[in-house]
Amino acid sequence: MPSLIRAVIFDMDGVLIDSEPVYLGMQARNLQTKYPWVTLESMYPTVGMSSQEYPRFMARLCRVPFTPEFEKELMQADENEPIHFPEILRPEARPMLEQLRAMGLQLALASSSPMSNIRQVLGECGLMEFFPVIVSGEQFEASKPDPEIYLHTMARLGRRPEECLIVEDSTYGVQAGAAAGGLVAALRDERFPFDQSRAQLHIESLSEVPALAACGGKKIRAAFFDVDGTLISGGSHKMPAILPAALDALRKNGVALLLSTGRHPLEIEEENLLPGLHFDGAAYMNGQLCEWKGHPVAQNLISPEELASLHAYLDRTGHSCIFLERDQMYANKVDDRLIAGQAQVGTAIPPLRSLDGLEQREIYQLIPYVTAEEEPELLAAMPGCKTLRWGNAVVDLTTKAGGKEKGIRALCEAMGISIDETIAFGDGANDREMLEMAGIGVAMGNALEEVKQSADYITDTVEEDGLAKALHHFCLI
């Protein structure tokens, strides 16, 4: 279960307003006449400093004693060029704050700037209404990177550190938030040599903050979808009308789209199960074949020894079975069980093929038509395999090394992301371990009860647009 974020604490300068280039440029210009060695780059360390520490640093930089006269000189330099703060307010700031407030999150501002400056900025930008808690660094003896300002703000909010998402940018600010025990999201700014290594999360825009809060501090970079009962309704294969637009919006928000299905890619293509949908990768056949950007990244084949045992088992029992190779599917026979099973998933009956030479074939998955009573004998003949039942007389059979969760791990490795950065959607028994493993597991409203118990969140059914509703719930679209 993702951690619950209850409050978001913002730094001001460099976060809500793009003030750092303005402040530093103005100060450098006003000081260079008297102190020509002062450059914009030499002033970078002042970003995030408190109003107490800043003049002392500048005295050292200007190679003069720190005196009231020098402090007055700095103040006069700052006053020489008035700043119109609404012009440097980040355009995404207000919509982001409105969304966070609508989500019921507590908001606070903790800035190293003097309180008078904070109130001026918030007042001129029309943001005062969003921050019932405002804390200034001038209230404390120690400034950032000391965590006191954030610990005090958390206490004012009545929240534990793990319930707080802190949005920072500067080296000192990130260090202060991390030392306070909060979850720190660092806003990247390539213009400044900030050390943001202590931050657990990194964002390119404030517009990412609502999703981080809704997802419990997880930055979702990949979404895995079961097909039947998740993207489309089971049996009828009906797709919700809003689904294509929802998935397109998800991709535009930087999330990779991947399938995680028990189906063979041929079924999806030939039956036109997902018209108009495009995916970046897939774990097919319950993770037996994994592809990323059209290239295989992992595969598990059933061994020749297991296939020989299966051959003997089928000859002995007369059961029907479907065989899934890389580029084809076929059955050994058609009987009432197979007809009923294919009708259950709304898929055509595959062509027939002899079992001669079965041991030499590259088989990824099997679909034996066996009852629960017959299943133990099959597994005894194939000890390196496991089954997942999806009907009264039918199972999926894969290697023990397979499984949707194994496929997701292989795909995450190929993408260079962690499991924690994933969200997965499913409804069936073969989805349970996948939902337990993903950063966020979402069960459809039509899911099996044991699958719902394994999920972090339960959405509505396929027919009720459950998938799109879940994406909205987690602010991913």
Each PLM stretch: what is its role?
Residues 2-44, 219-223, 227-275:
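Active-site neighborhood of HAD-like aspartate-dependent phosphohydrolases
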Residues 4, 82-109, 115-119, 236-255, ...:
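Short, acidic loop-to-helix structural element flanking the phosphoryl-transfer center
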Residues 27, 93-123, 177, 247-270, ...:
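Substrate-recognition element of Asp-dependent hydrolases with the DxDx(T/V) motif
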Residues 37, 57-95, 103-105, 220-238, ...:
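Metal-dependent phosphoesterase signature
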Residues 69, 241-337:
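Active-site phosphate-binding/coordination module
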Residues 86-87, 108, 114-165, 171-175, ...:
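Substrate-recognition "cap/lid" segment bordering the active-site pocket of phosphatases
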Residues 159, 309, 313-434, 446:
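Conserved acidic, metal-coordinating active-site core of Asp-based
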Residues 197-222, 240, 380, 397-477:
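Mg2+-dependent phosphoryl-transfer enzymes with acidic/Ser/Thr/Gly-rich catalytic loops
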